[in-house]
């Protein structure tokens, strides 16, 4: 199979969808891996690295896309990339369609088969292709929040761990999943006072046991959120409704209760954000201020640590890429119900219910198309 790996074009996105090691595995199975020239440079992988792995380089972007049967990406396709897709091609990447109606309609119009990393499930539960980037994003959220608390960044001028005689920052993490746990773990390690809010008592029990009571665990209610808003120096939104838009948990009105110079980091921005005042930002201009509260809403946080992220992503995606390349999308998904959960769009049909409901579009059962 002809497998194309384009260079990511989203603002400050330095990751690449495949490492040279991953390319070598695919080439060894008889597949033709075509990598856009310079695609891996941002992640520290040279063209020579890919050539040594047996991949071919292609400088002509149009030819790369036109010749491809399977296209591997990291971020959702940008407008010019959607225009390059055609019927018969398979796109495998993060899509996050519930936050992007125009992208959803563009992919439907393309006629391509689009499989989303983030909606693939695992037999033991969880989202195996979202987890590695969620781990990175959770840890980065604390770094970003700590930096945003600095006075020069518009923050209150608070050092996250404090110093002897001065209290540490109060950090609240909304959501105790992969992102939330990694954010809480990072903040705890830096010496902050950490509280995690979640709707799942079993999850809170797990966190309490795992971290031996060193972080507060609180059942998430309206009262708990209001208290967090009043007391926290840094709030990290780590809420996930798989494949659907994130709920707005902190409203514009609630900002008036926050401390001046406090910080909101919205890791859920890929799914529309979990704060009413959130809007996507970039690594070039990561923050803005609303009512005295600093907002950090970068939609591709792991892109800033591209080498780590690319390696972690390829480790997770490669078995699925191998299945697609060896079997074709239809048999690969027919053989694995958990993989089939990743199908979002096929031949002009929308096959992910939460996205269809978000935009009032017709929904078609994926199973009816997989066979």
UniProtKB/Swiss-Prot annotation:
Function: Catalyzes the reversible reductive amination of pyruvate to L-alanine.
CDD domains for this protein: L-AlaDH (cd05305)
Binding locations of NAD(+): 134, 198, 203, 220, 239-240, 267-270, 279, 298-301
Chemical reaction(s) catalysed: L-alanine + NAD(+) + H2O = pyruvate + NH4(+) + NADH + H(+)
Record pathway: Amino-acid degradation; L-alanine degradation via dehydrogenase pathway; NH(3) and pyruvate from L-alanine: step 1/1
Name of the protein in its database record: Alanine dehydrogenase
PROSITE patterns the UniProt entry points to: ALADH_PNT_2
UniProt remark on cofactor binding: Binds 1 Mg(2+) ion per subunit.
EC number(s) per entry: 1.4.1.1
Any Pfam family matching the protein: AlaDh_PNT_C
Keyword Heme: no
Organism: Halomonas elongata (strain ATCC 33173 / DSM 2581 / NBRC 15536 / NCIMB 2198 / 1H9)
Residue positions of the active site: 96, 270
Record-stated family: Belongs to the AlaDH/PNT family.
Alphabetized PANTHER family for the sequence: ALANINE DEHYDROGENASE (PTHR42795:SF1)
One MF term in the entry's GO annotations: nucleotide binding
BP-aspect Gene Ontology terms: L-alanine catabolic process
Superkingdom per UniProt: Bacteria
Obligatory cofactor(s): Mg(2+)
Residues where substrate binds: 15, 75
Key words, A-Z: Magnesium, Metal-binding, NAD, Nucleotide-binding, Oxidoreductase
Keyword Aminoacyl-tRNA synthetase: no
């Amino acid at each position: 199979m002809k497998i194309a790996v384009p260079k990511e074009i989203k603002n400050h996105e330095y990751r690449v969808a495949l490492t040279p090691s991953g390319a070598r595995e695919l080439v060894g199975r008889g597949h033709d891996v075509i990598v856009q020239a310079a695609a891996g440079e941002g992640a520290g992988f040279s063209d020579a690295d890919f050539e040594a792995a047996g991949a071919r380089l292609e400088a002509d972007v149009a030819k790369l896309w036109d010749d491809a049967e399977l296209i591997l990406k990291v971020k959702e396709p940008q407008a010019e990339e959607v225009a390059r897709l055609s019927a018969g091609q398979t796109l495998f990447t993060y899509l996050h369609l519930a936050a992007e109606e125009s992208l959803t309609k563009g992919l439907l119009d393309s006629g391509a088969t689009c499989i989303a990393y983030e909606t693939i499930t695992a037999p033991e539960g969880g989202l195996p292709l979202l987890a590695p980037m969620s781990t990175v994003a959770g840890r980065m959220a604390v770094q970003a929040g700590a930096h945003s608390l600095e006075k020069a960044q518009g923050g209150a001028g608070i050092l996250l761990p404090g110093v002897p005689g001065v209290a540490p920052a109060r950090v609240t993490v909304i959501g105790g999943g992969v992102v939330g746990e990694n954010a809480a773990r990072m903040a705890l390690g830096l010496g902050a006072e950490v509280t995690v809010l979640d709707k799942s008592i079993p999850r809170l029990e797990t966190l309490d046991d795992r971290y031996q009571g060193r972080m507060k665990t609180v059942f998430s209610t309206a009262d708990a959120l209001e208290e967090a808003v009043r007391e926290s120096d840094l709030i990290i939104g780590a809420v996930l409704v798989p494949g659907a838009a994130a709920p707005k948990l902190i409203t514009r009105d609630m900002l008036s209760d926050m401390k001046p110079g406090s910080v909101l980091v919205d890791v859920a921005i890929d799914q529309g954000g979990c704060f009413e005042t959130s809007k996507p930002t970039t690594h070039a201009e990561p923050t803005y201020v609303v009512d005295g509260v600093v907002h950090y809403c970068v939609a591709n946080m792991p892109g800033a640590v591209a080498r780590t992220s690319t390696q972690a992503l390829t480790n997770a995606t490669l078995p699925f890429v191998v299945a697609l390349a060896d079997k074709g999308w239809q048999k690969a998904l027919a053989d694995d119900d958990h993989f089939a959960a990743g199908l979002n769009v096929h031949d002009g049909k929308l096959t992910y219910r939460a996205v269809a409901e978000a935009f009032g579009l017709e929904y078609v059962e994926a199973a009816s198309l997989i066979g």
